[in-house]
């Protein structure tokens, strides 16, 4: 670990007029708003240069609580109304089921600028898809996918019950607490979250591969955005590739927007051949293009595939093998999405829609060519 130098420690100082205080505050009860601590975060935490991740509004660093030695994650946000909103929404959700906990928040000066520092529990188990990729030959089953979706749904249910829309539910924001088998999956990064009771959600900010159709145009949107994202994540969990693709190398192409708007996707074989009809039906209900027809979170949680996950078939899926084979591509996709997160403010009325006849799922075509060249490819599922 790289400890902070005296210079680094000195760069994170209390704002003018701030008073000292004590150590690790622990997570507040869900929904409780607290004021940031005004003394230096380095009084309580030893900072590292190790970057754990990049959020929508700031990077996340490794840190250690000085008294307990507890390893934590520190997110630095330069103070702004947007940053305050992120802290507020995450604080309201912190302590909820399957949501990353906030331990402390500080208001300090960094390089002469006021900033907010969010200390969170460290999610040492890594991202959802990385964990599945690393399984090797161990089969990933439909029942496991159902259990994962139930956990994600539990987090969304908690947020929606408090009239918070997350608006950026995606695999990269779903992290495990540890590498252990009993690790808990949790949702993080509230950089795009908004309260749905104050005003209609009209800001076109999102990660393109998991965006609901109504976000792609001037229509208002709400919690149903999160339900659409659940459908996309569920689709990927069950086969290893997303239902919608950009064919141009852009983060989001006109053709991809068109397919999302029209709800154009399929369940191609062999990856979907043995997946249950219940699972496919649930995906169809989540990917409805009309938000008023899409399932609510309560309906999702009450669907048999979710609330009776113990009777979901333990069918081996292609998911782990597909994710492993396309690992380099998935890293590229994630980079595209990360770079697009804060900048996607598109005037969709000005975009020329690409002819669907010229649109192909290039990743799926690539997989099919590989399968055609190997007579054993169609048996891959049985060898996981």
Swiss-Prot record:
Pfam families on file: Pkinase (PF00069)
Annotated active site: 168 (proton acceptor)
Activity regulation (record text): Activated following phosphorylation by p38-alpha/MAPK14 following various stresses. Inhibited by ligand 5B (2'-[2-(1,3-benzodioxol-5-yl)pyrimidin-4-yl]-5',6'-dihydrospiro[piperidine-4,7'-pyrrolo[3,2-c]pyridin]- 4'(1'h)-one) and ligand P4O (2-[2-(2-fluorophenyl)pyridin-4-yl]-1,5,6,7-tetrahydro- 4h-pyrrolo[3,2-c]pyridin-4-one), 2 ATP-competitive inhibitors.
Residue positions where Phosphoserine is found in the record: 253, 309
Residue sites binding ATP per the record: 52-60, 75
Residue ranges occupied by any Protein kinase domain in the UniProt entry: 46-306
Molecular function via GO: ATP binding; protein serine kinase activity; protein serine/threonine kinase activity
Disruption phenotype: No visible phenotype. Mice are fertile and do not exhibit behavioral phenotype. Mice do not show decreased production of inflammatory cytokines such as TNF and IL6 upon LPS-stimulation. Mice lacking both Mapkapk2 and Mapkapk3 show further reduction of TNF production, compared to mice lacking only Mapkapk2. These data suggest that Mapkapk3 may function additively in stress-induced cytokine production. MAPKAPK3 knockdown homozygous mice develop Bruch's membrane abnormal thickening and thinning progressing with age.
Motif (Bipartite nuclear localization signal 2): 366-370
Post-translational modification: Phosphorylated and activated by MAPK1/ERK2 and MAPK3/ERK1. Isoform 3 is degraded following phosphorylation at Thr-203.
Known EC number: 2.7.11.1
Modified residues (N-acetylmethionine): 1
Catalytic activity: L-seryl-[protein] + ATP = O-phospho-L-seryl-[protein] + ADP + H(+); L-threonyl-[protein] + ATP = O-phospho-L-threonyl-[protein] + ADP + H(+)
Tissues where the protein occurs: Ubiquitously expressed (at protein level). Isoform 3 is expressed in skeletal muscles and heart.
GO biological process, one term: toll-like receptor signaling pathway
Motif (Nuclear export signal (NES)): 337-346
Quaternary structure and partners: Heterodimer with p38-alpha/MAPK14. The heterodimer with p38-alpha/MAPK14 forms a stable complex: molecules are positioned 'face to face' so that the ATP-binding sites of both kinases are at the heterodimer interface. Interacts with TCF3 and with polycomb proteins, such as PCH2 and BMI1/PCGF4.
Family in the record: Belongs to the protein kinase superfamily. CAMK Ser/Thr protein kinase family.
Protein name, per record: MAP kinase-activated protein kinase 3
Biological source species: Mus musculus
Lineage: Eukaryota, Metazoa, Chordata, Craniata, Vertebrata
Primary gene name: Mapkapk3
């Amino acid at each position: 670990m790289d400890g902070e130098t005296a210079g680094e420690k000195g760069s994170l100082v209390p704002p003018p007029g701030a008073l000292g205080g004590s150590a690790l505050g622990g997570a507040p009860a869900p929904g409780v708003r607290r004021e940031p601590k005004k003394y230096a975060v380095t009084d309580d935490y030893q900072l590292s240069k190790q970057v754990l991740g990049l959020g929508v509004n700031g990077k996340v660093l490794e840190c250690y609580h000085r008294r307990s030695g507890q390893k934590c994650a520190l997110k630095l946000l330069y103070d702004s109304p947007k940053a305050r909103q992120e802290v507020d929404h995450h604080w309201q959700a912190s302590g909820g089921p399957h949501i990353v906990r906030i331990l402390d928040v500080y208001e300090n000066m960094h390089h002469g600028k006021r900033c907010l520092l969010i200390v969170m529990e460290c999610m040492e188990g890594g991202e959802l898809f990385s964990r599945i990729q690393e399984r090797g030959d161990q089969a990933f089953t439909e029942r496991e996918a159902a259990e994962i979706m139930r956990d994600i749904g539990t987090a969304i249910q908690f947020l929606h019950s408090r009239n918070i829309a997350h608006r950026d539910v995606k695999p990269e924001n779903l992290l495990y607490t540890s590498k252990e088998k009993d690790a808990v999956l949790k949702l993080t990064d509230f950089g795009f979250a908004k309260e749905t009771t104050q005003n209609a959600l009209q800001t076109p900010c999102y990660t393109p591969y998991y965006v609901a159709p109504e976000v792609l145009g001037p229509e208002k949107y709400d919690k149903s955005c999160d339900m659409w994202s659940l459908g996309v994540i569920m689709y990927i969990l069950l086969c290893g590739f997303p239902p919608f693709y950009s064919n141009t190398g852009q983060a989001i192409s006109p053709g991809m927007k068109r397919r999302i708007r029209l709800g154009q996707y399929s369940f191609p074989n062999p990856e979907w051949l043995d997946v249950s009809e219940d699972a496919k039906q649930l995906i169809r209900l989540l990917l409805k293009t009309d938000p008023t027809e899409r399932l609510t979170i309560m309906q999702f949680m009450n669907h048999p595939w979710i609330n009776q996950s113990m009777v979901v078939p333990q069918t081996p899926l292609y998911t782990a093998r597909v994710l492993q084979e396309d690992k380099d591509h998935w890293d590229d996709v994630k980079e595209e999405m990360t770079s697009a997160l804060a900048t996607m403010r598109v005037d969709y009325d000005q975009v020329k829609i690409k002819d669907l006849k010229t649109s192909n799922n290039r990743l799926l075509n690539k997989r099919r060519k590989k399968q055609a060249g190997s007579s054993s490819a169609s048996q891959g599922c049985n060898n996981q």
